Amino acid sequence: MFLDECGFLLIPNVRRTWAPRGHTPIIPHRYRRDKVSAISAVTVSPRRRRCGLYIHFDPGSNITHVEVAVFLRAVLRQLRGHVIVLWDGGSIHKGPDVRALLTRCPRLHVEPFPGYAPDLNPDVA
């Protein structure tokens, strides 16, 4: 299972604008910094050769080690047998809730990616 998390800022992204010469263009928008955080996992079944996608959105807050542990428990309920988790070296993967889950769940094995290798993780794309 490949696991990763990301965040999206919902602010306008203006590429081009137009205004008469001498007038600075003003683009009105609400200065609210709404955001959505997401955590997802891509699974590959070795026997049936099927892929699975598990995703959870958390609007308005950051993904913490608590959400990572809850997400892992939810995904483990859907999968059978031993599960190998491949993830980056993020600090939220080393929080107390995640460490407690890893010690309680013997069928869960973790393999970290090398230092900076997003191209190795299909969940990043």
Predicted regions and their residues:
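RNase H-like two-metal-ion nuclease catalytic core shared by retroviral integrases
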Residues: 88-89, 96, 111-125
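Short aromatic-enriched loop/helix-cap "lid" or pocket-rim segments at secondary-structure transitions
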Residues: 12-15, 98-99, 123-125
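Glycine-rich phosphate-binding loop signature in dinucleotide/nucleotide-binding domains
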Residues: 79-80
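Hydrophobic "anchor" residues on beta-strands that sit immediately upstream
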Residues: 1, 84-85
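Extended, low-complexity cationic-aromatic segments
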Residues: 1-73
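Short, aromatic/basic amphipathic alpha-helical patches
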Residues: 95-105
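Short, solvent-exposed loop/turn segments at secondary-structure junctions
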Residues: 10, 93-94
